[in-house]
Amino acid sequence: MKLSQFKFKLPEDKIALHPAKYRDESRLMVVHKSTGKIEHKVFKDILDYFDDKDVFIFNDTKVFPARLYGNKEKTGARIEVFLLRELNEELRLWDVLVDPARKIRIGNKLYFGDDDSMVAEVIDNTTSRGRTLRFLYDGSHDEFKKALYALGEAPLPSFIRRPVEEEDAERFQTIFAKNEGAVTAPTAGLHFSRELMKRMEIKGIDFAFVTMHAGLGNFREIDVEDLTKHKMDSEQMYVNADACRIVNNAKDEGKNICAVGTTVMRTIETAVGTDGHLKEFDGWTNKFIFPPYDFSVANSMVTNFHLPLSTLLMLVAAYGGYDLVMEAYHTALKEDYRFGTYGDAMLILDK
């Protein structure tokens, strides 16, 4: 398929700047693959489509406050540093993106905090905007991380055009976030409240948790028309024995398995064996899913409404069928659904 097939006009006022007041009260569009029927619901109604022993697979990654603002030595010029991942705990080395990149060179010192309490030195250039920083900090690793994160803020995507607010620390995180490492939230999971998950448990629905540390590659623009030539950034993922057991049992019993989000779908499609069963996995994936694609594990998925030309939209179109998903998006625009990270949700049912 071609990149241009995923272009559509998205007015800026359709992008949600804030989450719904309550997690489970965002809107939910239900799309039935077999009939093409589209229903309009509230997210907590998702319960009506699942039964005893069905399984929801969640991504339990935890977002860390990855965006820092600081100053460059001597000039005092304001700079932004986006933390990607820790490279070496002992040496306090981090892989980061910097802005403005042209002014930040090897050997520069960067200062963070009102009293310049945190200092970092640029020790390598990795890409045009990528740098390796060494943070200069006396104290334990835990104290360092605490001090670093106190200076950072929730790394909202650039299409949410507003300053970070207090609510973002909580709402840009799922309630089941556990394993730290993501620089963006697995957005489909944001709609699940404690109350909804309790009601799901009471109904006998099982939960499986996998981990994919969602990275900035989710928002990187594709610069090739031929999608087979696009390379995804690698993301770290884990699938443990518990998740395999829960998912494989449900599959063997013909139960409905729901992938909550594109990160979960990429994780399970990476970790599936040739027999269609989920296998344990600890490593990295750069799997890019776009139409046509044969899915092996899930027979339903929850996802948000994504931006034009995004790899996220391509995965959803591969799962729901290109024509049906693009029709659903057209309907969503007409019916004033909210798009993006803090927007509304879609449930695609294949059973």
UniProtKB/Swiss-Prot annotation:
The keyword Acyltransferase does not apply. This is S-adenosylmethionine:tRNA ribosyltransferase-isomerase. InterPro entries: QueA, QueA_dom1, QueA_dom2, QueA_sf. It is found in: Cytoplasm. One of its GO terms (cellular component) is cytoplasm. One of its GO terms (molecular function) is S-adenosylmethionine:tRNA ribosyltransferase-isomerase activity. HAMAP family: QueA (MF_00113). Its EC number is 2.4.99.17. Transfers and isomerizes the ribose moiety from AdoMet to the 7-aminomethyl group of 7-deazaguanine (preQ1-tRNA) to give epoxyqueuosine (oQ-tRNA). Keywords: Cytoplasm, Queuosine biosynthesis, S-adenosyl-L-methionine, Transferase.
